[in-house]
């Protein structure tokens, strides 16, 4: 890296920290220490909710992983991860968020305690923590380090970069709380939107030998099959990572898990100052997800047309593209933007993990009389512990072929049972707590079978590239099995009328529960735009 790039990187990173500090100091503070630290005092407005949602999700595990998958697929099927996310976010805004806010919950598992029992909440909280420590946090650290290393060809150990990023992210989350995390997310989000969109623009210009329009023409006319969004196989007749049948099985449910029940994501919306502000933020973020493929998929497609890029494995595509198209003077600035997205996802997951441990396990079992200050103190200590654990695990991910597929597959082990009990908790009243527990373990066991043994030589319609049952179909079968088990138990051993009455009781909520009047129209518009994008790309790829 040149001196100018280093100075630009340092200046931009410090500037974000400075403006975050100034903005947070001016925001309304809650007298409740726990509420202030873990939900930002419930003072977030819709732009901050939207910005934090987007940047928590839009990080290097997406930029590196999804662009790599698109490149490896030689097709645009990865668009489904963004398009169906928009649908799941609509469900969050209209269905899940009103139920979470109605009782003033601080965590999503708290809803399960109300609907089922404390043990169910504890099991789900434990599963979330397992996922954050073994999957989400290490993946963010690994992909972030890999992106920075490949962008600048830095001759530094991956371990060292992981430690640097992990330490910086920990400082935001542990010492600043959710409010600092959300504000820094919003500031970094603006930079990432500008910088992220610049990469495909410059890539198309480079493809067109200096002409953006020529680049677009090449993209549309030279092997337009690369733009297929609904297909099972690519030009090489290889089965792609997201065959179109999976859109109607596991894909939709894994999106609902991530956007509607995952503590890391939903905690931002739960910190909104009112239901209307939360719905506006979630739906604006949903609309912006439709812009996401320009950053998360298009660079991978452009790279397919650029044989001169030095790409050893597919997860190196994004870093190679950035290094190829950006002028030297701007590398430091983009590195700061990328660092912001890395820190955002890392510190968001860290804050959510601290929230779950402190409120569920420490307050719930270890010290039930703990004060707000004690809970926050323990949360910070636990944050340090899992930050160190994730830094130790992250470099081990270098052994995986596709880090994005690793993220989604391992997530399935605990998300299958979680999404099932959340959906039944919202849609039914008679399913008892024992059904939730049995259903969770049945779902996990069946998904574990598909992950480690699987069905071999299945019909091509249901197969992955190796001929085994595609993992998203396995996810769907596991999910349906868990639901069936819970419903059967609920039929023969339903809740009593008294138990249902207790579940229906609502605690007081600290926020205004008036919904946003434009939420349904906005949702319809987002769905219409999604279908239009699919139709247009399908026509172009023919």
What are these model-derived regions, one by one?
Residues 1-542:
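Membrane-embedded helix-loop-helix hairpins and adjacent transmembrane boundary segments
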